[in-house]
Amino acid sequence: MNLIEELNLNKEDVVSTKKLSIKGEKKVFDVYRIPLEYLKYNKKNGRIATYISQFIDEGHDFSKDINEFNNIIEKFIEESNPDALRKTKQNIKILSQTEPAVVLSNGIIIDGNRRFTSLRQLSREGAGAEFNYLEAVILDSEKYNDKDIKRLELNLQHGVESRVDYNPIDRLVDIYRDLIENGGVFTPEEYRGETQKTLKEVKKDMEISQLLIDYLDFINRPKKFYIARKQQVDGPLREIYTILKSDKIDQEYKTDIKEYLFTNIMALSGDTTRRIRELKTVFEDRRLSKELLEEVEQDEILDDITDYFNELDVKCDTVELSSELIEKIKSTTEEFVERKKYKNARNQPIELLNKAFKTLNEIDTEALA
């Protein structure tokens, strides 16, 4: 299908224009009003990556009927951020569509999924004929390859509008697929150029994305990203990244440290991110770190957890440790965090005295004479 030909569009149908950067060039494109029934969601949309993977893992197939297909994806768009959709829908209802979307000539939406969703819902609700159309740029699907389209998506996501509503796990999945999986679609340098990030930030995101993959492998749920979304592991993974990047930890035991930290994601309750952060000073104290890992090995905690995950039904969406394992991990973590706090408190008077002596030694006694 070619929308331009199918709808017999010409210059008289142009309602506005939109500037886009594609294939390294900035161009001004015409914007048309397209009937909603000719349009289709993009199931490769990074915003709903975890929902798509869950849908497929559960054994479902996408319908070839465009309306049924769109109904499935619409539900994912709404679930991913209902508040943002509600705001977009309300704005469109009051002001109409103010920002043009971007679609391919085959009808697949590249940018504007939430606007499309809002219009579909308003149209179904009988809000008015004006909501039966999406205003969008139409790009020739034969002219641009997947990399060109992905580059455009990144440019739109990180350009004028700050996309703060992007689920952090879906973002990590997107980074993994764009930069790591099968060699990546982009080099880190190319990605930096499209996202307005520094190369250091891009490489950090890559390492955290890889930690997400490692974590899911550790719990024997490889690439089941929706589990990570449900567990809200973004904060804990970022703390783990900080710990593993510390030059104070013993690099010889880096893998054991990482796996023990992964177990804490599963075992700790409350503010997991903060509680994992507290382990940083423990692992930076090499003596305490060694003692903790020796205790973990002696109690066979990591071995027991590996066996536990291997015995769980891989198809099970809920991943929880047994109460016995949770208690083992919690008590070990709490013991060493408290020991480190006690050690710091005990050393504080000595540190204060050293600072005092240093200050006294720096006093110019001749100036006092």
What residue ranges belong to the model's regions?
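Short, charged/polar connector segments at secondary-structure boundaries
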Residues: 1-130
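Amphipathic alpha-helical "recognition" segments
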Residues: 127-134, 198-270
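Charged/polar low-complexity intrinsically disordered segments, enriched in acidic residues
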Residues: 287-369
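Short runs of predominantly hydrophobic/aromatic residues within well-ordered alpha helices
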Residues: 115, 172, 188, 233-237
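Amphipathic, charge-rich alpha-helical segments that serve as recognition/docking helices
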Residues: 76-77, 124, 128-217
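Helix-turn-helix/homeodomain-like alpha-helical modules used for DNA recognition
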Residues: 27, 56, 242-297
